[in-house]
């Protein structure tokens, strides 16, 4: 059923960013033919993808649909995406990144980030288990389907898109300058080093950044035989000196029909080369730039870096900039799909794909920063073969419509890696290019790996519609994996969904105000193998030393994991119910959906006794976790005229996560993890001693809560210094700052509510768009403020303006530095103009100007509240001296169609 929706709206079950006209309610399953879903599919106009300069393809997805969170790396915001989360965290160890399918080929978020944004025709995000169950053991964390542009068959066409932007820092830490530093030291009678300079180290390590994107595409042919080729280039010099990346992408697609259009073939080739130049220790760089004595010089003096021997946790920022952490990623993919219509109702489809990826990582830490220096080089490669075949049947008779599919699939990966490290550098000029000249190689610093997992699958789907208004969809997928235990080789993942198109009822047809009204519900199960490797079910060993045997050096081996033949898939079961309402020819569209999911057989590494176990950790399926939420989408077009149009779109997502259990029985033995376990702490540069655990996993609570002492205020210690007044919560007469002591649950790191919004206005050939996103209901621990206000480290380490007046000499964590993380970010403002031209060689011409990261509205006192609030690791919810400088991007764009 074709839908040509003029307005823009967000569906909760699946979301598509695509042109207005497409076959709604269908998804593509890795090269298999499209299947009708009784869940909802929404159309978002291409204008919403225009965000000025896009670093990568997933920038276009950020904020566009409820329940999908795209976050940049907590260390920087240059380009590479650290995570994508679909309806939150569903596992501790099993992995939480969604499955990515690019033109039917299994992929990942990292590969998607290398695709040129203008090459993408549509995103489809599957969130409900009734859809993700079609992907079986890989769909538990959601699925992002990407369809790239193909030839149109409308004759020869050329298109060019280009953007150029500059980046300017507009917010940084306000540290003491040289005069303020000297005055504060003299005020308190402290000895200090004065080198006679007044250096702003943050300014010294930054620059005006620039980014340019260029994209050229050719297409031609007829509807029966057509092609499309495209080339993209991104060059980004960031605001941090010596940091930047380049991405080169090429893509070719050919489509051919034959035998009276009964046979259709699609062949595509994709390749990309991504080079990234980075710093090895960004936290060290930013902390050194902030905390370095401002009377010290930035550059070398007499050929040597000037270091403060009393400040062992910092290094001259110029020296830290000499560190290297460079990567080079190469991706290649080729796929072929053939579809043959055997009859009017029956077709057969075959799909094959080959993917190759290589990653080189080279690291260099000079002796100016590390005592002996450090070198590392590693190379990792992967090859993936994917093949499937399916039979598709479709038949309509009277009031009935039936679609069915059965298929089989086989996938094999080969993953290899080699790496080596060395120290004892005698010459810093060679960087990592002469690793053989290093004096020593740490034991265990050279290693390699090999994995070859396989996955075989069978699947089927039946979709039945009655009266074109009642729909039932049932699917089943069985996956057999080489990575799980022998007793659990096969996992089965069913789903069922129902929908009711109420607008088709006679009693609603007469209500012209209602354009669309649909109810839907579904239940399904999907799996997750992310926490299991090829050899996890086996006892594994590695070298742990070298001894002399008969005067010959002999490597000794030690156990590094226990075998667990009972390992199996994590399983996520999801139930959802939702509704879609369109009024006044869809000028107002409302969508809402509630979902509840539960992950069982959740993987966790348990402490076990030795003996009877050979190793002190065991990976087992004993835990469980739940997620529930409500997602609401609103689209409103208050003005819709020939020369003027205004669209307002918003999506809201409420989410609640809960860690249900980490205990159970394994082989007759009761196992349980600690109810309270620290996940993240203040550490590294500038944090010396103290009880510094901040974020915890606690059974019965959301994953990632702040478990902190309560600070009643600041008190004087009698010496003119001030300390945090910690409350004795258990009233036993002493204050215990350790885990389980005088601590309480003070909030959660993950937002309870997220928001995405797009407002677009068109007047004749001019258009203006504003895109916003926000997060609410969570907290951030301002570890940067704690460290930079601590006067016990002064004057060895510089402090924030205002810190000398407070004179706090305490670094223990408490809720004093726990702040609301709520924010509303004005992500992009774009003004564009479609230049009127006479139709000739040039078919269309558009120019635009954009500002990215326009402003952030927040009460948070740190640099930015947009830190890692979603990825479960040691940085979750903690602002700990890692914050990348806040900058804006101003860009100009040009789009030409020939």
Region spans (language model):
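Conserved small-residue
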Residues: 159-196, 419-421, 620, 637-747, ...
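Short aromatic-centered micro-motifs
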Residues: 100, 299, 464, 705, ...
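Extracellular/periplasmic, surface-exposed regions of secreted and cell-surface proteins
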Residues: 96-97, 209-212, 247, 253-259, ...
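C-terminal beta-barrel architecture of Gram-negative outer-membrane proteins
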Residues: 733-734, 767-827
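Short, small/polar-rich motifs associated with maturation and membrane association
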Residues: 1-259, 263-272, 306, 317, ...
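Acidic, glycine-rich flexible loop segments
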Residues: 283-317
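Glycine-rich, aromatic-lined ligand/substrate-binding cores of catalytic
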Residues: 748-780
């Amino acid at each position: 059923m074709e839908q040509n929706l003029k307005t823009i709206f967000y569906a909760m079950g699946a979301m598509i960013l695509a042109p207005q006209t497409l076959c709604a309610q269908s998804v593509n399953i890795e090269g298999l033919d499209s299947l009708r879903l009784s869940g909802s599919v929404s159309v978002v106009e291409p204008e919403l993808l225009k965000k000025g300069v896009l670093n990568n393809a997933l920038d276009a997805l950020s904020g566009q649909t409820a329940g999908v969170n795209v976050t940049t790396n907590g260390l920087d915001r240059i380009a590479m995406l650290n995570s994508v989360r679909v309806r939150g965290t569903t596992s501790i160890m099993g992995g939480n990144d969604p499955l990515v399918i690019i033109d039917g080929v299994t992929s990942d978020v990292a590969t998607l980030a290398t695709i040129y944004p203008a090459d993408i025709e549509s995103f489809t995000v599957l969130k409900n288990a009734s859809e993700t169950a079609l992907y079986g053991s890989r769909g538990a964390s959601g699925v992002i389907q990407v369809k790239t542009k193909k030839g149109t068959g409308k004759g020869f066409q050329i298109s060019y898109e280009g953007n150029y932007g500059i980046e300017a820092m507009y917010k940084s830490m306000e540290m003491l300058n040289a005069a303020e530093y000297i005055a504060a030291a003299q005020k308190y009678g402290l000895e200090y080093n004065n080198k006679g300079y007044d250096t702003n180290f943050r300014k010294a390590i930054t620059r005006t950044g620039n980014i340019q994107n260029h994209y050229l595409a050719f297409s031609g042919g007829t509807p029966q035989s057509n092609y499309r080729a495209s080339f993209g280039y991104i060059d980004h010099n960031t605001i941090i000196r010596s940091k930047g990346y380049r991405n080169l992408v090429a893509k070719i697609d050919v489509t051919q029909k034959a035998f009276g259009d009964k046979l259709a073939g699609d062949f595509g080739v994709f390749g990309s080369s991504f080079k990234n130049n980075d710093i090895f220790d960004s936290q060290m760089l930013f902390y050194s730039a902030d905390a370095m004595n401002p009377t010290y010089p930035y550059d070398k003096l007499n050929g040597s870096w000037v270091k403060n021997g009393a400040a062992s946790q910092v290094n001259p920022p110029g020296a830290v900039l000499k560190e290297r952490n460079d990567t080079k990623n190469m991706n290649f993919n080729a796929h072929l799909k053939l579809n043959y219509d055997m009859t009017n109702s029956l077709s057969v489809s075959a799909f094959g794909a080959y993917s190759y990826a290589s990653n080189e990582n080279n690291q260099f830490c000079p002796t100016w920063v590390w005592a002996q220096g450090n070198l590392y080089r590693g190379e990792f490669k992967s090859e993936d073969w994917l093949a499937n075949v399916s039979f598709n049947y479709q038949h309509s008779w009277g009031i009935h419509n039936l679609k069915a599919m059965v298929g089989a699939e086989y996938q094999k990966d080969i993953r290899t890696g080699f790496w080596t490290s060395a120290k004892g550098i005698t010459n810093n000029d060679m960087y990592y290019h002469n690793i053989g000249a290093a004096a020593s190689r740490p034991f265990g610093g050279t290693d390699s790996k090999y994995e070859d997992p396989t996955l075989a699958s069978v699947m089927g789907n039946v979709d039945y519609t009655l009266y074109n208004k009642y729909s039932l969809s049932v699917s089943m997928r069985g996956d057999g994996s080489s990575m799980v235990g022998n007793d659990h080789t096969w996992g089965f993942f069913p789903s069922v969904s129902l929908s009711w198109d109420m607008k088709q009822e006679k009693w609603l047809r007469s209500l012209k105000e209602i354009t669309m009204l649909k109810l839907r519900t579904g239940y399904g199960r999907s799996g997750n193998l992310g926490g299991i490797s090829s050899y996890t079910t086996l006892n594994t060993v590695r070298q742990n030393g070298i001894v002399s045997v008969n005067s010959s050096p002999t490597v000794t081996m030690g156990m590094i994991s226990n075998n667990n033949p009972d390992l199996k898939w994590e399983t996520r079961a999801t139930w959802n119910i939702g509704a879609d309402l369109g009024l006044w020819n869809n000028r107002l569209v409302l969508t809402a959906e509630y979902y509840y999911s539960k992950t069982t057989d959740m993987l966790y590494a348990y402490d076990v006794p030795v003996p009877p176990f050979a190793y002190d950790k065991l990976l087992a399926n004993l835990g469980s976790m739940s997620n529930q939420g409500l997602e609401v989408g609103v689209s409103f077009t208050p003005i819709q005229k020939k020369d003027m149009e205004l669209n307002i779109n918003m999506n809201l997502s409420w989410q609640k996560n809960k860690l249900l259990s980490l205990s159970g029985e394994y082989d007759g033995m009761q196992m349980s993890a600690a109810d309270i376990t620290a996940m993240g702490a203040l550490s590294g540069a500038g944090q010396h001693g103290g009880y510094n655990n901040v974020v915890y996993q606690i059974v019965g609570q959301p994953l990632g809560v702040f478990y902190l002492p309560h600070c009643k205020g600041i008190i004087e210690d009698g010496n003119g210094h001030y300390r945090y007044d910690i409350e004795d919560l258990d009233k036993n007469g002493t204050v215990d700052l350790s885990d389980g002591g005088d601590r309480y649950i003070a909030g959660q790191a993950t937002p309870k509510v997220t928001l995405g919004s797009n407002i677009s206005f068109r007047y004749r050939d001019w258009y203006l768009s504003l895109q916003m996103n926000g997060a609410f209901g969570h907290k951030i621990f301002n570890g940067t403020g704690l460290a930079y206000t601590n006067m016990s480290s002064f004057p060895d380490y510089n402090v924030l303006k205002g810190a000398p007046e407070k004179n706090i000499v305490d670094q223990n964590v408490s809720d004093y530095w726990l702040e609301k993380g709520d924010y509303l970010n004005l992500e992009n403002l774009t003004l564009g103009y479609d230049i009127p031209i006479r139709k000739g060689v040039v078919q269309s011409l558009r120019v635009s100007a954009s500002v990215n990261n326009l402003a952030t509205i927040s009460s948070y006192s740190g640099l930015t509240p947009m830190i890692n609030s979603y990825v479960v690791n040691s940085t979750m919810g903690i602002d700990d001296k890692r914050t990348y400088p806040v900058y804006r991007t101003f860009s100009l764009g040009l789009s030409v169609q020939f």
